[in-house]
């Protein structure tokens, strides 16, 4: 991977801290707090409010970072949109190849995709909001803006490797804890983790990763029949 000579897109120290610390809050503490306060929440409602609260807090915390990178999007929209589209086609191809390998070993549907599809049937509006808008914003600020952005200041390879692994774990851990065979599905999320990091680094604009993530989620949900 060649170094990028564009001015680096970086958060402030407190923004790095907030974006990274929000990851365990989002995964573990906030859902339990919401269920304690609102025990009648549906699964779709729990996910919606977890992402909505995260989107609000992270946007407020990282507003300056988002605005600076939006200026970069505004200055060269065709380049950034083109890189997002390029990333999407690379993502489709790589996920297709990895899926062939995974399904050869474990010929059943990805449980995360199945869960999203079931929720979309029951609570379509909320799941559309989560999948297309809230999740890309929250996840890109946590993973690409926070984890990757901080670690690459010291070691790019570590930044790529750890961010890819955490992103894959984030989408699979709850299923893998019920059956260890589901750890294989980690492989399906590694290409996305890499390509989202690379798209962000190549353009030095977090909006490239956010837009790519939005596009991928939208098409994936449509393909799943959501």
Which stretches of residues belong to each language-model region?
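Gram-positive cell-envelope targeting signals
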Residues: 1, 5-17, 26-27, 31-34, ...
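Interfacial transmembrane-helix boundary/kink motif in multi-pass membrane proteins
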Residues: 2-24, 43-51, 67-100, 152-158
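Alpha-helical transmembrane segments in multi-pass membrane proteins
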Residues: 14-67, 112-114, 126
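Alpha-helical transmembrane segments of multipass membrane proteins
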Residues: 22, 26-31, 54-59, 90-99, ...
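Membrane interface segments of multi-pass transport proteins and intramembrane proteases
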Residues: 35-45, 106-111, 148-161
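Juxtamembrane helix-loop-helix connectors linking adjacent transmembrane helices
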Residues: 39-43, 67-135, 178
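Internal transmembrane alpha-helix with an interfacial aromatic "cap," most often the third helix
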Residues: 63-71, 138-144
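Transmembrane helix-loop-helix hairpins at the membrane interface
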Residues: 96, 100, 104, 124-226
């Amino acid at each position: 991977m060649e170094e990028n000579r564009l001015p680096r897109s970086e958060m402030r120290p407190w923004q790095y801290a907030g974006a990274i610390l929000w990851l365990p809050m989002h995964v573990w503490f906030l859902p339990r707090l919401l269920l304690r306060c609102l025990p009648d929440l549906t699964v779709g409602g729990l996910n919606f409010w977890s992402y909505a609260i995260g989107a609000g807090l992270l946007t407020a915390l990282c507003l300056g970072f988002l605005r600076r990178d939006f200026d970069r999007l505004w200055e060269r929209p065709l380049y950034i949109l083109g890189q997002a589209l390029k990333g999407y086609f690379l993502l489709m191809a790589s996920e297709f190849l990895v899926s062939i390998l995974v399904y050869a070993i474990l010929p059943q549907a990805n449980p995360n995709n199945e869960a999203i599809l079931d929720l979309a049937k029951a609570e379509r509006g909320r799941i559309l909001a989560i999948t297309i808008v809230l999740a890309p914003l929250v996840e890109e600020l946590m993973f690409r803006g926070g984890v990757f952005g901080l670690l690459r200041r010291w070691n790019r390879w570590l930044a790529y490797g750890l961010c890819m692994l955490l992103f894959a774990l984030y989408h699979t851990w709850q299923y893998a804890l019920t059956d260890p065979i589901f750890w294989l599905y980690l492989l399906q999320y590694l290409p996305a983790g890499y390509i989202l990091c690379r798209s962000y680094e190549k353009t030095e604009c977090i909006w490239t990763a956010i837009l790519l993530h939005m596009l991928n989620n939208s098409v994936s949900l449509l393909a799943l029949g959501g």
